[in-house]
Amino acid sequence: MTTYREAGVDVEAGYEAVKLMKNHVKRTFRPEVMTELGGFGGLFSLDKEKYEQPILVSGTDGVGTKLKIAFLTDKHDTVGIDCVAMCVNDIICSGAEPLFFLDYIAVGKNYPEKVAAIVKGVAEGCVMSGCSLIGGETAEMPGFYPVDEYDLAGFTVGIVDKKKIINGKTIKAGDKLIGLPSSGIHSNGYSLVRKLINPTENNLKEYVEKLGCTLGEELLKPTKIYVKTIMDIIGKYEIKGISHITGGGFIENIPRMIPDGLRAQIQKGSWPVLPIFDLLRDLGNMADKDIFNTFNMGIGMIMAVDAQKADEIISYLDSKGEKAYVIGSISEGEDGVDIC
């Protein structure tokens, strides 16, 4: 008689992984969570009295080929933060507060400790975002993924009052663009990074003076989560538009928040570019157009604000220990971005 285990699926390992991750998941629970881990669906009680016209906002994303760095370094407890960050940073561009999160992990072979380490990172990202990890799926797929590899994706739902939706419609010529620093490459552009660096177990262990850490440590720095900073600032100031600088860099993402007939002018040198981007530029002999169309260049989130409020907002953020820079402005013109 042929068993499921002989086909490559270890159900007992799945049970063990759930057991190991339970405490990580529970620490993310908000009071609105109505279910324990292991049910068929996650229940979340929505307090509609807090909103005049509650609008749900959803987002989904994955970590991409940054996972290859985790495989080579055998470090798996931070990529979950990346997964959460990529989702929640998207929905806060609409002004939405993240409520809950679900993850999907597909593995070639279920190693319970490894899966628990991944979920630990997801839980950490949820705590940083103030949202609850109310469900997920770990799929063991023998013959589909190599035994030491996996994929990781997530899904989040948030909420915003209809009158407080941030959609960029009020952005006008003369408005200023405020940039919030990134922690590093974040989770986009890693196919190019890997082509330029050709990562191996050995070179990822090498200390790079200009980075101040090993190459592996730099490439695995978790994506910065901006939820608490953005939720704080939109509660005190009018933020006209927000752009999460992900795949496509400045060139693709800034126009997503700007109305037709307006153009963004980005001033080079107005913020400190992280050393990793100088390294990548040199390795690939990349022109500005290409590198700004791929990487975040040290700015992970951009806000459009009234010009008269820009300095005040930056001072407020500074008082909270958050760096921010006026990195450009809005002008009339054909849709697009100028890197000046």
From Swiss-Prot:
Keyword list, A-Z: ATP-binding, Cytoplasm, Ligase, Nucleotide-binding, Purine biosynthesis
Recorded metabolic or biological pathway in which this protein acts: Purine metabolism; IMP biosynthesis via de novo pathway; 5-amino-1-(5-phospho-D-ribosyl)imidazole from N(2)-formyl-N(1)-(5-phospho-D-ribosyl)glycinamide: step 2/2
Keyword Cytoplasm included in the entry's annotation: yes
Catalyzed reaction equations: 2-formamido-N(1)-(5-O-phospho-beta-D-ribosyl)acetamidine + ATP = 5-amino-1-(5-phospho-beta-D-ribosyl)imidazole + ADP + phosphate + H(+)
InterPro entries found in the cross-reference section: PurM-like_C_dom (IPR010918), PurM-like_C_sf (IPR036676), PurM-like_N (IPR016188), PurM-like_N_sf (IPR036921), PurM_cligase (IPR004733)
CDD domains: PurM (cd02196)
Cellular component aspect of the GO annotation: cytosol
Membrane-spanning parts: none
HAMAP family given in the database record: AIRS
Protein name: Phosphoribosylformylglycinamidine cyclo-ligase
Organism: Ruminiclostridium cellulolyticum (strain ATCC 35319 / DSM 5812 / JCM 6584 / H10) (Clostridium cellulolyticum)
